[in-house]
Amino acid sequence: MRRALISDIHGNLEALEVVLADIKSQGIKEIFCLGDIIGYGPNPRECIDRVIENCKVTLLGNHDQGAMFDPDGFNIGAERAIFWTREQLENPSDRVNNEKRWEFLGMLPRTHRQGPFLLVHGSPRNPLSEYIFPEDIYNHRKMERLFQLVEKYCFQGHTHVPGVFTEGYQFFAPEEIDHEYTLGEGKVMINVGSVGQPRDGDPRACYVILEDGLSSSEVALESIPTAEYSLIASAGPGEDFDPETEERFAPPAKSSSPSGPIRVTFRRLPYDHEATIQKIYAISELEPFLGDRLRQGR
């Protein structure tokens, strides 16, 4: 079955509309969103509505949580954007729809398992907030701990940098693998990139198509709410990680094995980023830099 995995929309309606249209043109019926629907961008309400309408599974991102609670660890620009986003979702002129949006955000799980696949926003260790950057392949201790929590394949977002991490301390950017990767016996973590705020030097919107070799009848679904996590303090020194926030999952249940090859395809799509930029410029609470960076994909 073919599924689309999207992440890090960040209130960028122009990018999201292009991605949804491309997914539809591919004949794909199921879309999974890995979080951060909002934050940074000028259209938070519209993006939430599109995700509600189109996505079968949606996970909680750190910016989604930041809108509901006090933002933690955000820089000044990101914090101002989140407070502005919260104001849009509290606007009394759209009270009924905003109540539905808050209810939707409040019910989002932090992780989802489907067959041999684990889906998170950040990492398998801390699904909300931990970053896994390409340069982390040189931090073997960190990577070993992360892969210990991956049964087979993990998909994530959060860094806005797409690519494939292997258990052998390698990272492959999409252009290095001709934008396609076939999964084998080894464990991998795959970053699906960002729809609305790419940061790999390519300003085009990014998402992933997963051809998973499973039929709908073979798939076991499991979304795990925050309350079922247990906190542990097992991170070692020098990992650039706060042990007080580390989270570990219960051992994954046995899942169906794919009956065919599993392929991942990275899709890059141009969109009218200038329209998004001008919207950002027109909102005083949003830093102009949030628009400028869309031109460079940084």
What do the PLM-derived regions correspond to, one by one?
Residues 10-15, 39-41, 65-68, 125-127, ...:
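Active-site environment of divalent metal-dependent phosphoester hydrolases
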Residues 6-7, 31-36, 40, 57-62, ...:
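Active-site neighborhood of phospho(di)ester-bond hydrolases with catalytic His/Asp-centered motifs
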Residues 47, 53-117, 126, 130-150:
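Active-site neighborhood of divalent metal-dependent phosphoester bond hydrolases
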Residues 23-28, 148-150, 209:
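Glycine-rich phosphate-binding loop signature in dinucleotide/nucleotide-binding domains
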Residues 1-4, 112-119, 183-188, 260-262:
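Beta-strand-turn-beta hairpins that frame and shape the catalytic cleft
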Residues 1-54:
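N-terminal active-site segment of His-dependent metallophosphoesterases
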Residues 167-298:
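Acidic, His/Gly-rich catalytic cores of divalent-metal-dependent hydrolytic chemistry
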